[in-house]
Amino acid sequence: MLHSIALRFEDDVTYFITSSEHETVADAAYQHGIRIPLDCRNGVCGTCKGFCEHGEYDGGDYIEDALSADEAREGFVLPCQMQARTDCVVRILASSSACQVKKSTMTGQMTEIDRGSSSTLQFTLAIDPSSKVDFLPGQYAQLRIPGTTESRAYSYSSMPGSSHVTFLVRDVPNGKMSGYLRNQATITETFTFDGPYGAFYLREPVRPILMLAGGTGLAPFLSMLQYMAGLQRNDLPSVRLVYGVNRDDDLVGLDKLDELATQLSGFSYITTVVDKDSAQLRRGYVTQQITNDDMNGGDVDIYVCGPPPMVEAVRSWLAAEKLNPVNFYFEKFAPTVGN
C-alpha cells in the first residue's frame, strides 16, 4: 500500500511524496529527488532527525545517541528508519533548497471571478485534468501577478486533490493583485502559482475544534471543512466556527457554510460583526462570542486565522481568562499594497 507523505521544510515549503509500507521515508524521498540530510542510513548518526506531526509509523531501529526514548515519545523520527503505516506529515529540520527540492509551479486558467462581498473577490482556476494540486487543508499558495515578477500569498479555499482551486482575496484599494483582479483579469486568463506553503493546516481531528476566522481568514477554514466533509466519517468531533468581520457587507461564503453544515455532522457556525449598527444577531469581536461549551473545559483544538491584531487579541483573551487549549494553531495575514 502506498501512503502520501507531506514533507514540511524549514523554509515553509511542503512537498508530497508517496511511500510504501516497507520503504523508509528517506528512501522514498530520494526516489523523488529529495536529498534529506543523511550520514549513515542506519539509525546511528541522527543527522536526518525530523518530527512526525501527523500519522502512524514504525520508527525502525536506531541507537539512543541518534534518537532518545524521550524524543521518540514526543514524535521525533529518523526518516532513514521510519516506515509510514498511514499518510503522514513529517517536518524536516532543513530547508527545501538544502534538500534539492524543486519548486512545484503550476498554471491554472481562470473560470470564474466574482465579488463575494463589497470587500472580497473570489475566483476559481481550472488546473490541467492530468494534474492534481496537492496541499494540506489550510495551506497557501504564492500567486504570480500576471505581467509582473511579483507574487502574493493566498490560502486555498478549496479542498485538496481537485482539478480546480479557489481563493478569497481582500479587495485592497492600492493592492496590486486585487487591483488586477478588479480591473484587468478576464475569464480564461492563465495564472501561475507555486506551493504549497505554511504550517497552518488541519491536524488529525481527535477532539472538539474551535475555528476563529477574521475577514478573508475564512479561506483556509473553508478548505478544512470541505476536506472533513469529504472524509464521510461519523466519528469526527464537533467543529465550531466563529466568523468575524468589521461590517455586514464584509461577510462572504455564508451559502457555502450553510451547505457544509448539512454535509458535516457536528459542524455549526456563527457570525459576528464589529459595527455597532450591524443587522446581524451578534455584534462585537470573535472573543466575545466564545462560550464555555466552545472551550470544552480546555479539551479543544483552536485554529485562528486573521489579521495580526485579531490573532493577538485571541492570545491575550485566552491568557486573561486562564484558558489553555490542548493545541493552538494560528496564521496571521496582512495585505501587501503599493508598488
UniProtKB/Swiss-Prot annotation:
Pathway where it operates: Xenobiotic degradation; benzoate degradation via CoA ligation
Annotated region described as Ferredoxin-reductase, given as residue ranges: 98-336
Stored Gene3D superfamilies: 3.10.20.30, Nucleotide-binding domain of ferredoxin-NADP reductase (FNR) module (3.40.50.80), Translation factors (2.40.30.10)
Residue span, 2Fe-2S ferredoxin-type domain: 3-96
Keyword Flavoprotein: yes
UniProtKB keywords: 2Fe-2S, Aromatic hydrocarbons catabolism, FAD, Flavoprotein, Iron, Iron-sulfur, Metal-binding, NAD, Oxidoreductase, Plasmid
Free-text comment on the cofactor: Binds 1 FAD per subunit. Binds 1 [2Fe-2S] cluster per subunit.
Gene Ontology terms for molecular function: 2 iron, 2 sulfur cluster binding; ferredoxin-NAD+ reductase activity; metal ion binding
Annotated InterPro entries: 2Fe-2S_ferredoxin-like_sf, 2Fe-2S_ferredoxin-type, 2Fe2S_fd_BS, BenC-like_FAD_NAD-bd, Beta-grasp_dom_sf, Cbr1-like_FAD-bd_dom, FAD-bd_FR_type, Flavoprot_Pyr_Nucl_cyt_Rdtase
Record GO biological process: benzoate catabolic process via CoA ligation
Reaction catalyzed: 2 reduced [2Fe-2S]-[ferredoxin] + NAD(+) + H(+) = 2 oxidized [2Fe-2S]-[ferredoxin] + NADH
Annotated residues for binding of [2Fe-2S] cluster: 40, 45, 48, 80
Location of the FAD-binding FR-type domain: 103-203
EC number of the protein: 1.18.1.3
CDD domains in the record: BenDO_FAD_NAD, fer2
NCBIfam families: BenC
Quaternary structure and partners: Monomer. It is part of 2-halobenzoate dioxygenase two component enzyme system. The other component is a dioxygenase component consisting of 3 large (CbdA) subunits and 3 small (CbdB) subunits.
Function per UniProt: Electron transfer component of 2-halobenzoate 1,2-dioxygenase system.
Record-stated family: Belongs to the bacterial ring-hydroxylating dioxygenase ferredoxin reductase family.
Protein name per its UniProtKB record: 2-halobenzoate 1,2-dioxygenase electron transfer component
Upper lineage: Bacteria, Pseudomonadati, Pseudomonadota, Betaproteobacteria, Burkholderiales
